[in-house]
A protein has these predicted regions:
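Hydrophobic helical membrane-anchoring modules
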Residues: 1-2, 169-231
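Short, well-formed alpha-helical segments that are part of the catalytic scaffolds
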Residues: 9-28
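Acidic helix N-cap motif at the loop->helix transition within catalytic regions
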Residues: 17-21, 42-50
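A conserved acidic beta->alpha catalytic loop
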Residues: 25, 37-45, 85
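Conserved donor nucleotide-binding strand/loop of the catalytic core
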Residues: 31-34, 45-72
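Acidic donor-binding/catalytic loop of UDP-sugar-dependent glycosyltransferases
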Residues: 43, 83-97, 169
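Short aromatic/hydrophobic "clamp" motif used to bind/position activated sugar donors
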Residues: 78
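Conserved donor NDP-sugar-binding/catalytic core segment of glycosyltransferases
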Residues: 89-119
Length: 231
């Protein structure tokens, strides 16, 4: 089995409350960690600089932040991680095994949502089915890909939202998308804030809107709550 170097790219914006916990998981790891700040107004940058390489890219959105991190990455493999998400302990082994597979261009992990609400377990099952049946993981599942393949694909499209969805749909044409048999654990904060089923409904409406050709900027405003009445 080949041994690859891995760069973890974490786009952030006002994540001071959680970024330290996220970065601590890499303290005893040999991976490169790049935090790409989008113009935080809190202590995110100061905290992150103690534990990772930090750059600031304002006004580019998450897609621009991830592309900037990828440009600077020194490793063979890129792994894009949300600021509120933890990887499984053996993620290096899993990433290496998957990208060693013939005709596999990229991968991601299953999803576990931090929270006791039983309905979250249903969401996890639905994510597992969508990811495995349709090879369609989302960004909160820690997408990983070789830097060479990422560059050849043109990186993430400059979209206000759905950049992960668009990217996966595009690279599926170049090879298989594999799902690692272990979950990342992501914060349940968004589900807790709006409620599990309302959050799920909003997510599905965003996808439908994207397929209908509604502009990503309008979809992003809807997702963030701007211009959205209580459902």
């Amino acid at each position: 089995m080949a041994q690859y170097t891995i760069s973890i790219i974490i786009p952030v914006l006002n994540e001071a409350a959680i970024i330290k916990q996220t970065l601590e998981q890499f303290q005893d790891s040999e991976v490169e960690v790049i935090v790409v700040d989008g113009g935080s107004q809190d202590n995110t940058v100061a905290i992150a600089r103690q534990m990772a390489r930090v750059i600031t890219i304002e006004g580019k959105g998450r897609a621009g932040q991830m592309n900037a991190g990828a440009d600077l990455a020194r490793s063979e493999i890129l792994l894009f991680l949300h600021a509120d998400t933890r990887l499984p302990a053996n993620f290096i082994e899993l990433v290496t095994q998957i990208l060693d597979r013939k005709n596999t261009v990229a991968g991601a992990f299953e999803l576990a949502i931090d929270g006791r609400d039983k309905s979250l377990r249903w969401i996890e099952r639905l994510v597992r089915m969508r990811s495995r049946w349709f090879s369609l993981p989302y960004g909160d599942q820690a997408i990983f890909i070789s830097k060479k393949a990422f560059v050849e694909a043109g990186g993430f499209a400059d979209l206000a939202i759905m950049e992960d969805f668009e990217f996966i749909k595009r690279i599926k044409k170049k090879g298989k998308i594999a799902i690692a048999p272990a979950p990342v654990t992501t914060s349940g904060r968004r589900w807790q804030k709006l409620g599990v089923w309302q959050t799920t409904l909003i997510n599905q409406l965003i996808i439908i809107g994207y397929y209908l050709g509604i502009s990503p900027t309008k979809l992003c405003n809807f997702y963030r709550g701007r211009g959205r009445k209580k459902l």
